[in-house]
């Protein structure tokens, strides 16, 4: 065989080997990615903003962060998640294989029993009809203590609430968080105060409605 033919065969063989290796690598990578997605389902989970979880947690400190994150995945809205929490029912925990537990671990008191039984904290009563008023009363006391903690008593008047709502809309209309740490902390503080006041107003309306139903 002539040198030219040998060189041509070597080039063809090299190209063939490289092509086969590339095809094998692509197929293998696709299989790994597909199996990872199908086995865990983690890649299909909607993203959750940890800052939103923190905001809800400040209003309802007894709720599990993973349960808050799981509800935010479904509602995609902080106010909607707060409404769900105000109903007096415990927010459900995510599935066992959820990636949310890596970011928001269960508290030490929750344990594995929270998964199987989805138990309610001792201060939440949700088992019968009378539990609605009990849960509302407890939540109202909790909001009252939060208002005292953050010195928000002076902002409970109707005029202050209206101005607070206006400020709340201005804050939420910001599409991006401030760049400096100080501005972010101030923004979170305002959001926290506005959420506590809004939650208190909703809870007062709920308690008033329950009293009217009893009468």
UniProtKB/Swiss-Prot annotation:
Transit peptide: 1-29
Residue ranges with Low complexity bias: 122-140, 153-165
UniProt-listed CDD domains: CUE_AUP1_AMFR_like
Keyword field contains Acyltransferase: no
One GO cellular component term noted in the UniProt record for this chain: Hrd1p ubiquitin ligase complex
Domain CUE: 48-90
Basic and acidic residues composition bias: residue spans: 180-191
Keyword set includes Ubl conjugation: no
GO MF, one example: ubiquitin binding
Location within or outside the cell: Mitochondrion
Gene3D superfamilies in the record: DNA helicase RuvA subunit, C-terminal domain
Keyword terms: Mitochondrion, Transit peptide, Ubl conjugation pathway
Domain of life: Eukaryota
GO biological process per UniProt: ERAD pathway
Region (Disordered): 109-191
Protein name (database record): CUE domain-containing protein 4, mitochondrial
């Amino acid at each position: 065989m002539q040198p030219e033919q040998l060189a041509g065969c070597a080039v063809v063989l090299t190209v063939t080997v490289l092509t086969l290796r590339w095809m094998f690598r692509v197929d293998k990578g696709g299989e790994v990615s597909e199996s990872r997605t199908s086995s865990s389902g983690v890649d299909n989970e909607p993203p959750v903003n940890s800052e939103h979880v923190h905001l809800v947690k400040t209003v309802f400190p007894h709720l599990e962060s993973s349960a808050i994150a799981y509800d935010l995945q479904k509602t995609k809205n902080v106010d909607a998640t707060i409404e769900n929490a105000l109903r007096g029912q415990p927010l459900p925990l995510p599935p066992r294989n959820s990636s949310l537990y890596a970011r928001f671990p269960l508290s030490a008191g929750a344990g594995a029993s929270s998964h199987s039984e989805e138990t309610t904290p001792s201060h939440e009563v949700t088992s019968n009809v009378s539990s609605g008023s009990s849960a509302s009363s407890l939540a109202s006391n909790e909001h009252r203590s939060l208002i005292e903690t953050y010195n928000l008593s002076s902002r409970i008047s109707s005029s202050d609430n209206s101005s607070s709502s206006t400020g709340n809309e201005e804050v939420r209309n910001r599409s991006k968080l401030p760049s400096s740490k100080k501005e972010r902390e101030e923004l979170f503080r305002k959001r926290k105060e506005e959420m506590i006041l809004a939650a208190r107003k909703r809870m007062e309306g709920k308690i008033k409605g329950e009293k009217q139903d009893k009468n």
